[in-house]
């Protein structure tokens, strides 16, 4: 699944470890005497979000991150289908965006917090503005035109979704 691939590349978690941790986050973690499911069903590669989730995400972005990070319209990824995707369910996301990874860290193991942070930030960033870069290219050619060297680089101008979903 996409979750397993992303957890492997970003966190170094194996597929079964990822799913065991996700299962626990889905079934519930005890927070202040109450067992709370922190993520939606995790055995899916679905990309659609419920209207309520989108509304909650957009309100959170506007109020907690900044209006400049909020696209004019909600972003929809339902047309993008992964090969062999299991899409009967909504995309994996936090059940309540207000439960930030930092706010519930003390209730989670280190690995649970890492995976929850990945799910939380990836889901929320899906409704944020794109990052903006300036791309520069320099070409140097020798006097006799025998040798040409080209170098390109990008400079981040606006962090957009990268503000919370770091590209590590």
Kindly give the residue locations of the regions a language model identified.
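Core catalytic DNA strand-manipulation module of type IA topoisomerases
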Residues: 1-168
């Amino acid at each position: 699944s996409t979750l397993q691939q992303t957890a492997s590349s970003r966190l170094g978690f194996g597929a079964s470890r990822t799913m065991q941790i996700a299962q626990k986050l889905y079934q519930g973690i005890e927070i202040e005497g109450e067992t709370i499911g922190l993520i939606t069903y995790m055995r899916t590669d679905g990309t659609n979000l419920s209207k309520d989730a989108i509304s909650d995400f957009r309100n959170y972005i506007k109020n907690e991150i900044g209006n400049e990070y909020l696209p004019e319209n909600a972003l929809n990824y339902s047309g993008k289908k992964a090969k062999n995707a299991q899409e009967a369910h909504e995309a994996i996301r936090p059940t309540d965006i207000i439960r930030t990874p930092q706010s519930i860290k003390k209730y989670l193991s280190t690995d649970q917090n890492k995976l929850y942070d990945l799910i939380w930030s990836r889901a929320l960033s899906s409704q944020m503005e794109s990052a903006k870069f300036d791309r520069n290219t320099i070409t140097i050619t020798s006097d006799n035109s025998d040798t040409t060297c080209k170098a390109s680089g990008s400079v981040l101008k606006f962090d957009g979704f990268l503000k919370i979903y770091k590209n590590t």
